[in-house]
């Protein structure tokens, strides 16, 4: 939930800087981009992947959940449904990162980048909290870099 809120805040800032972005679409998709995780993961305290989560993943599951809700909204514009679906399906940005599609519209690019920014900075924050030092913290496989805290 904190991640989705952070991504939404980033997208709000981005939309204010790039006026050609459809802010309503971007913010809606930012709030919903990881909704599939509620079905992908089991309940606390187990927090393990469900069978459906292992088979489909949160991206596909989230897309299906959102599309199902949209079907129940009378006269929902099909183009907006397609754009929302695309943003959700492409939010990891690359096929090798689990997205079934690469971003093809500006809002999908912005969402993918905001998601990536938040995930990477959160990873750094966790590394910094784990070791209270200004020394090099070692190689982080996800960030693909040897990291250290800024000296300030």
Segments and roles (model prediction):
Residues 1-9, 35:
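All-alpha helical catalytic cores of prenyl diphosphate-utilizing isoprenoid enzymes
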Residues 147:
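Active-site cofactor/co-catalyst pockets and adjacent glycine-rich loops in catalytic enzymes
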Residues 125-143:
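Compositionally biased, low-complexity linear motifs
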Residues 31, 112, 137-141, 150-152:
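N-terminal intrinsically disordered, cationic/polar leader segments
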Residues 13-131:
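Divalent metal-dependent catalytic cores for phosphoryl transfer on phosphate-bearing substrates
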